[in-house]
Amino acid sequence: MALAVVTAAVVVAGGATVATRLVADRQSERGAGRITAAPTPSPAAPSPTPTPGADVTGPLNLLLVGVDTRVSVPGWEPHGDAVLVAHVTRGLDRAYLFSLPRDLLVDIPAYPKAGYRGGKTKLTHAMSYGSRVPGKPKQPSTTQGYELLRSTVSGYTGLRFDAGAVVTFSGFEKLVDAVGGVDLYVDQRTVSLHRRPDGRHRDPAPSGGGYVGPQMVYAKGERHLNGWQALDYARQRYGLDGGDYARQRHQQQLIRALMTKMQAEGLPRQPDRVEQVVGALGDTLVYAGGPRIVDLAYALGGLPADRLVLVGLPGEGVGRGSAYRGEQLKPVGRQFLTALEEGRAEQYLADHPELVVKR
């Protein structure tokens, strides 16, 4: 999954991310307490260059975050607008990708680094609460925000993350353009709230709230989307049958489309090209982890797109109207997380095929 795919696996969709226990950390833990004498240098011929990603082993859990940073607003705190988890099996031959609702009601742990005391609120806020830097109100830290979001998602799912990525809206647009766009099946007519047919942003409504002007429309059927179109399509939730849950599905489908395109070009197995793509994203992509991003991409590059299983976790609102507090997963969704943690995901989905996104 190039970058997992470029960390979207990365991604995001993104936003391909930042990490906790990575392969390097695991190796350090295995060797803790052991002292080994350094080998005596030999004048023999140099050893062959190891294959990239040779030390990357499964299973792997990757956290993929797409953030809205509102770069036009100085000091705007990043929000986790898209939160996806990719679980790669032990043999690196199958992966499951699922989304968590941005409004999922969760327990966000205390995070002293940002002065946050903890509380129960929407998942999207973990990124912004964690990004706050005491004494620097206009200088939010995306890395800090990711750390708190990662801890929150880990606590909710029971999964420990090996790597991840945070990508901004503009970064995702650049990523799609860097591979020449993606081919995608649009599963329902989608009207853009944000863009005009020519790609320009719609004007804010004079009365405040919402936008005015012509709207881009994505007709149902097979489509080729460039960067701004893919980003715009992935952002829409209003007016869709399924609302935010439909948007989650569209984001997952885009990641698979990215993966398909990257693999068709052999990108994951071209370390130099991967580095060029990542370099072009600049600070719109935040990644940290044990394995280098090129190693992660190479190790997962042999995973066929049809072995990336998209999983839709159904949810429902908690409270209504002015009493609305957020979303919660239905029991069938929570039980999938348990099955995933216990290594029973394949059988669980065989028993609950309605959770698998078909295309």
Predicted regions and their residues:
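Non-catalytic, solvent-exposed segments at the cell envelope interface
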Residues: 2-4, 13-359
